[in-house]
Amino acid sequence: MTQLVTRARSARGSTLGEQPRQDQLDFADHTGTAGDGNDGAAAASGPVQPGLFPDDSVPDELVGYRGPSACQIAGITYRQLDYWARTSLVVPSIRSAAGSGSQRLYSFKDILVLKIVKRLLDTGISLHNIRVAVDHLRQRGVQDLANITLFSDGTTVYECTSAEEVVDLLQGGQGVFGIAVSGAMRELTGVIADFHGERADGGESIAAPEDELASRRKHRDRKIG
């Protein structure tokens, strides 16, 4: 496993900055303690389920979502989004706010990282340690992230890439919280389809599906007109 808040080497892992093994993982988000490591090990041995994305392709990194949409998708407040952008914790990779009237545009990967940050915060991890973990994740592509599971004991963040590493961590005798990046990605893929996206290259925007109420209003307006 890779310990993401120091450069210390674990018994079975690599130091931060080395490329860890890309074993296929598919954990559900869960908590665990020593003694119940069998569940984690069983999950770790299974492959990533197919259909992570609807068309089995990587999300278009030229499609961005404005700040308010990114907040709703990731489940955070706009105040959090703005603070994390200003402190360079999670910066929009497609377009930053520059001057009056400009809008930040967040990519699929940006919003995925926002979700991960939120979940790590909810477990009590400090922003300092989260920043180290985010810097590590930022180096990965979207497909690489699908093979990562993050675990935390409330202080340290670990990246696990095999069942053996999960067992080692759970046998430490303290509770841990697991975040399956692949699970967060599937969840995000389903939710993000309901939001309007903008193309950074000036191409056609991706409109959110029209809800039933809006459709009825439009139909009524046509009749009146």
Swiss-Prot record:
Q: Which InterPro entries match?
A: DNA-bd_dom_put_sf (IPR009061), MerR-type_HTH_dom (IPR000551), MerR_fam (IPR047057)
Which residue ranges are recorded for the region named Disordered? 1-48, 201-225
Q: Where is the signal peptide?
A: none
Which SMART domains does the entry mention? HTH_MERR (SM00422)
- Gene Ontology molecular function: any one: DNA binding
> Organism source for this protein?
Mycobacterium tuberculosis (strain ATCC 25618 / H37Rv)
Q: Which SUPFAM superfamilies match?
A: Putative DNA-binding domain
Query: Transcription regulation: is it a keyword of this entry?
Result: yes
| GO biological process assignments | negative regulation of DNA-templated transcription
Where does the HTH merR-type domain start and stop, copy by copy? 64-136
Q: Known PROSITE patterns for this protein?
A: HTH_MERR_2
* Name of this protein: Uncharacterized HTH-type transcriptional regulator Rv1830
Biased composition of type Basic residues is found at: 216-225
Q: Which UniProt keywords apply?
A: DNA-binding, Transcription, Transcription regulation
UniProt-listed Pfam families = MerR_1 (PF13411)
Q: List the disulfide bonds.
A: none
**Basic and acidic residues bias (residue ranges):** 20-29
